């Protein structure tokens, strides 16, 4: 049976990366929340 998670570095960055988050208003809100929460890693 096919495993559902087949990691790709490029896809991970493109979908969940910092620049992707910064490119939309809601993405910036995600970063803001994670900063507020005190996450050491903001994005993938």
UniProtKB/Swiss-Prot annotation:
Residues 1-23, 30-44 have a biased composition (Basic residues). Residues 1-44 are annotated as: Disordered. Transmembrane segments: none annotated. Signal peptide: none annotated. The keyword Aminoacyl-tRNA synthetase does not apply. One of its GO terms (biological process) is translation. InterPro entries: Ribosomal_bL34. GO terms for molecular function: structural constituent of ribosome. It holds the Pfam family Ribosomal_L34. One of its GO terms (cellular component) is ribonucleoprotein complex. It comes from the Bacteria. Keywords: Ribonucleoprotein, Ribosomal protein. The keyword Ribonucleoprotein applies. Gene3D superfamilies: 1.10.287.3980. NCBIfam families: rpmH_bact. Belongs to the bacterial ribosomal protein bL34 family. HAMAP family: Ribosomal_bL34 (MF_00391). This is Large ribosomal subunit protein bL34. The lineage of its organism: Bacteria, Bacillati, Bacillota, Clostridia, Thermoanaerobacterales.
């Amino acid at each position: 049976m096919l495993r559902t998670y087949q990691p790709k570095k490029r896809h991970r960055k493109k979908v969940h990366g910092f620049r992707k988050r910064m490119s939309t208003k809601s993405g910036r809100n995600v970063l803001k929340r994670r900063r507020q929460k005190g996450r050491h890693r903001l994005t993938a």
